[in-house]
Amino acid sequence: MDGAHDMGGVKGFGPVVPEPNEPVFHSEWERRAFALVVAMSRPGGWNIDMSRFARENRPPADYLGKTYYELWIAGLETLMIERGLVTREEIEAGKVLAPPKPGVKPIAPQEVTPAIRR
């Protein structure tokens, strides 16, 4: 897939300068975004490749205008909408507007860490 996510060697963006001792998460919301994506993968029925595609398959302006974990949330929204787990209206309202999809089993809290390690 060729897109904004695959910009290795593109001129005009400058070098990638890693932070010394850079943390995995710069703030708590990033940690939560990562956990949400992992926790929803089983009930949503997608894998890491599908999740990555949902993050990366977006218009260049959208992709370049978001931070790393904002892309994770945008990808999660896409996957959840595609599978009927949530509607765009519910995301915009920030609350549930309809009964949940039947037969969707949430991941148990104790299963999240093993899921991350896979």
What are these regions (language model features)?
Residues 1-118:
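A charge-rich, low-complexity, intrinsically flexible signal that marks solvent-exposed coils, linkers
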